[in-house]
UniProtKB/Swiss-Prot annotation:
It catalyses: Hydrolysis of terminal non-reducing N-acetyl-D-hexosamine residues in N-acetyl-beta-D-hexosaminides. Pathway: Cell wall biogenesis; peptidoglycan recycling. Its main location: cytoplasm. Belongs to the glycosyl hydrolase 3 family. NagZ subfamily. Keywords: Cell cycle, Cell division, Cell shape, Cell wall biogenesis/degradation, Cytoplasm, Glycosidase, Hydrolase, Peptidoglycan synthesis. NCBIfam families: PRK05337.1. One of its GO terms (biological process) is peptidoglycan turnover. GO terms for cellular component: cytoplasm. This is Beta-hexosaminidase. Plays a role in peptidoglycan recycling by cleaving the terminal beta-1,4-linked N-acetylglucosamine (GlcNAc) from peptide-linked peptidoglycan fragments, giving rise to free GlcNAc, anhydro-N-acetylmuramic acid and anhydro-N-acetylmuramic acid-linked peptides. The keyword Ribosomal protein does not apply. It comes from Xylella fastidiosa (strain 9a5c). The lineage of its organism: Bacteria, Pseudomonadati, Pseudomonadota, Gammaproteobacteria, Lysobacterales.
Length: 335
C-alpha cells in the first residue's frame, strides 16, 4: 500500500517501528541513504531483517543525473545519450539500451535492492524534469527503446516500471515544484505519448508509475488520482495487469489535492496499488490515514527479487566486465 522513505544510512528506532505496520509494502532509497556499496548491502539486509513480511526495496537508478548509488557502481550515461545513436545505427543503439538496462539492474540486484524505477519512456520534448532522461522525442523510437530496455532488465532478473504514465515529456513544468497541465486531447496522446507505453506493456513490463500531470481534456484530476486514466485507459483499453505506483506525494504538483491523508486515499481510490511517501516527515500522517484500510500486497510479491548473484557473483560474470567496457568506450564516465 505505501512505499516509504527513510532518513539516513542506518535505521532509526522509529523507522523500524514503521516497518512493522502491514500498510508498509516497502522502502524507496535515495542518495541520502547511500554511503558506499557495502553500506547499501548492509542497509538492504537490515531492512529485510526488521520485519518478517516480504519487503519491496526500490531506488531510482536511471543513469545520468538520476543515479542514487554512485561510488562502486557504473557511471551510467543518460538515456538521451543512448537514444542519440539511433539515427546512425538503430541496431547498435538498441543493443546498447539492452546492455545499459542489464548493467543497471544487475548492480542494483547485487546490492539487495529489488527494483529500479526504470525506464523513463516519456518523450524528450523539453520538459524541465525529464531533460536528458528521455531517449528521444519520437514516440516510435522511444517505443523501440522501451522494448529493448524491458528485455535487458528482465535478462538481469529485475521487474520493469514504465514511467511516467501517460507521458510527462510534452509539458514544460517540473511537477516536483509546480502543477503541470497538458491540454491535448486523448486522440493526440494515443498517437504520441502512449505509444511507448503500449510497446512496453506488450513487451511484458511489470509495473507503471503515474505522472502528476493534469490532462483536462481527458480527466479533471492529475493522472495518478484519476480512475479514468488508471482503470479505464491503462487497465481497460491498454490491458495492463501489473502494479500501478503513484509518484511521490511530497511533490508540489499534488498540493491542490489536499492533505497527506487526502492524497493517499485519492491515489488508492483511483486504482494505484502503491503510494510513494518518499519524505520521512510525511510517513506518520500517511500511516495514520490508512489505519484500518485493507492492505492488499499480493500484487507486489512478484516484484520482490529472488536469486540475485550478490556482488561476488556479479563481478565473476564475464558479461559484467564486457558490458562495462563497451559503455565506457562509447560514453566515457560522463553522467
Amino acid at each position: 500500500m505505501l512505499l516509504i522513505g527513510v532518513a539516513g544510512t542506518t535505521l532509526s528506532a522509529q523507522e523500524v517501528d514503521w516497518l512493522q505496520d502491514d500498510a508498509v509494502a516497502g522502502v524507496v532509497l535515495f542518495k541520502r541513504n547511500f554511503a558506499s556499496r557495502a553500506q547499501i548491502v548492509e542497509l538492504s539486509a537490515a531492512l529485510r531483517e526488521a520485519t518478517p513480511r516480504p519487503l519491496l526495496l526500490a531506488v531510482d537508478q536511471e543513469g545520468g543525473r538520476v543515479q542514487r548509488f554512485h561510488e562502486g557502481y557504473s557511471a551510467l550515461p543518460p538515456l538521451q545519450g543512448v537514444g542519440a545513436l539511433y539515427a546512425r545505427d538503430p541496431e547498435a543503439a538498441l543493443e546498447l539500451a539492452f546492455e545499459h538496462a542489464w548493467l543497471m539492474a544487475s548492480e542494483v540486484r547485487a546490492s539487495g535492492v529489488d527494483l529500479s524505477f526504470a525506464p523513463v519512456i516519456d518523450l524528450g520534448r523539453g520538459n524541465r524534469a525529464i531533460g536528458n532522461r528521455a531517449f528521444s522525442d519520437d514516440p516510435h523510437v522511444v517505443a523501440a527503446f522501451a522494448r529493448a530496455y524491458v528485455q535487458g532488465m528482465h535478462a538481469a532478473g529485475m521487474p520493469v516500471t514504465l514511467k511516467h504514465f501517460p507521458g510527462h515529456g510534452s509539458v514544460l513544468e517540473d511537477t516536483h515544484v509546480d502543477l503541470a497541465v497538458d491540454v491535448r486531447p486523448l486522440e493526440t496522446l494515443e498517437c504520441e505519448d502512449l505509444v511507448p507505453f503500449a510497446a512496453g506493456i506488450a513487451a511484458g513490463a511489470d509495473a507503471v508509475m503515474m505522472a502528476h500531470v493534469v490532462y483536462p481534456n481527458v480527466a479533471p484530476e492529475p493522472a495518478g488520482f484519476s480512475a479514468h486514466w488508471i482503470e479505464v485507459i491503462l487497465r481497460g483499453r491498454m490491458g495492463f495487469r501489473g502494479v500501478v505506483f503513484s509518484d511521490d506525494i511530497g511533490m508540489a504538483a499534488v498540493r491542490g489535492v489536499g492533505s497527506v491523508a487526502g492524497c493517499v486515499h485519492a491515489h488508492l481510490d483511483a486504482g494505484c496499488d502503491v503510494v510513494l511517501v518518499c519524505h520521512p516527515e510525511l510517513v506518520n500522517d500517511a500511516l495514520s490515514a490508512v489505519a484500518g484500510r485493507r492492505s492488499n500486497t499480493a500484487a507486489l510479491i512478484g516484484l520482490i527479487g529472488r536469486g540475485a548473484l550478490g556482488w561476488d557473483g556479479l563481478l565473476a560474470d564475464v558479461r559484467y566486465g564486457s558490458i562495462q567496457s563497451r559503455l565506457l568506450e562509447r560514453f566515457g564516465t560522463s553522467t
